[in-house]
Regions:
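A conserved short coil-to-beta-strand element within the FAD-binding core of flavoproteins
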Residues: 1-2, 83-94
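Rossmann-like dinucleotide/flavin-binding elements
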Residues: 1-65, 98-164
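Short, conserved active-site loop motifs that form the nucleotide-linked donor/cofactor pocket
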Residues: 12, 78-80, 85, 138
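Generic cytosolic/nucleocytoplasmic N-terminal low-complexity/intrinsically disordered segments
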Residues: 49, 76, 91-93
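Conserved N-terminal Rossmann-fold NAD(P) cofactor-binding segment
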Residues: 69-70, 94
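Helical element adjacent to the flavin cofactor pocket in flavoenzyme catalytic cores
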Residues: 71-78
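Residues that recognize and position ribonucleotide moieties
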Residues: 80, 88, 106-108
Length: 164
């Protein structure tokens, strides 16, 4: 989790956990992170009738065909995306950002905050398992390899299964 004040509040969750119904989600959601995980979560939550806004640190989203398709779906659902936003703090009823470039402070009222940024792979955990079963070939796929999209994870899992 990113280290910001309020990150440990009870209404702050990992976006994938919310998408899998593993935690309670309110009606007005701020998603922190506009990468594939954040955009996928925005599609999921807006499809459930939630009001969603995505906040991203970088100035522009896009690049891959998958991202462009997610952005198209979000536009259809009227999901707002705010770029150039650095998360400053999380409160009970809002999130606070600094607008990069202007230094302005911006607040967004919400009842749920979903984190889709700051993901890191845990390859050291995989390496520990390799030593437990040295005769077994271990394949690393999905976010265990590096933060990536669900499509890439499925492709890697498929390739690993073929090699087993």
């Amino acid at each position: 989790m990113p280290e910001v004040p309020g990150i440990d509040l009870p209404h702050v969750h990992w976006a994938p956990d919310a998408d899998m119904n593993k935690c309670p989600v309110g009606d007005k959601i701020a998603i922190i992170g506009g990468g594939s995980v954040g955009l996928e979560s925005a599609v999921t939550q807006s499809s459930r009738g939630k009001s969603v806004r995505v906040f991203e640190l970088v100035p522009a989203l896009g690049g891959t065909s998958e991202t462009r398709e997610l952005l198209r779906l979000l536009k259809e659902k009227s999901v707002e995306i705010s770029t150039n936003r650095r998360l400053v703090s999380i409160h009970k009823d809002k999130v606070v950002f600094t607008v990069i470039g202007t230094g302005d402070i911006e607040e967004y009222k919400c009842d749920t905050v979903l984190i889709a940024a700051g993901l890191v792979s845990r390859r050291d955990t995989v390496q520990a398992f390799r030593h437990l079963l040295p005769e077994t070939e271990v394949y690393i796929a999905g976010d265990a390899q590096a933060p990536r999209s669900i499509g890439e994870a499925i492709h890697e899992g498929f390739n690993a299964a073929i090699n087993i």
